[in-house]
């Protein structure tokens, strides 16, 4: 098994979460992200963490793989926290200099954003790690099927999402390959000013975009050679079927959601 998992990567292991209907997992993930923004106070966040911990445990994907998937985003998290801490107002002022100030309100907002960011990323990673891209695309198409009545191109949207999810880990792997190649040539991405570091990213971005366009063109040629027609209804080898474990999982999600909103109201 690969030692890391990135958003968009499917990890083929046998687990309860892998066997659930992809439509249920997709709706649950979407609902989980929505209620994150309704969280208020330690108790509601504790429920969210417990729910996410249960999903991670049921997925049977090692924790170090989730950490490896979250690690590349640490700089985004750090930058977001720094902006919130230095430029948010409210509460007791601990330090002040010009437009920047460290306040209790800014620290609280930074912690909330940090918690939301990590929960959203990990929940999305659980979804993509336990659901193959094609099954996820089928789930999206199935859930969006009523929109066909108003002429929404559901098939094309589902295919685009499937391709995007498939390309995310591929592009990330290509970034790692290019970075290692540049480092082997003596390029140091960790030293120097911000401008210098950004300038050193150019040798990464150019081959990355060239490779992405080349892969997209190859994929388009392959799909055309196989007779893909976006206007035709696709057939599926594996049909989506709702089973008893899916109903049990849905009931658990509903119960946890009720507990979440009860805890929020009582705060």
UniProtKB/Swiss-Prot annotation:
Protein name from the UniProt record: Energy-coupling factor transporter transmembrane protein EcfT
A matching Pfam family: CbiQ
Instruction: Show the CDD domains listed in the entry.
Output: EcfT (cd16914)
Q: Which family does it belong to?
A: Belongs to the energy-coupling factor EcfT family.
Q: Which organism is it from?
A: Limosilactobacillus fermentum (strain CECT 5716 / Lc40) (Lactobacillus fermentum)
The record's principal subcellular location, in a coarse class, is: membrane
Q: Main role? A: Transmembrane (T) component of an energy-coupling factor (ECF) ABC-transporter complex. Unlike classic ABC transporters this ECF transporter provides the energy necessary to transport a number of different substrates.
Q: Name one GO molecular function term.
A: transmembrane transporter activity
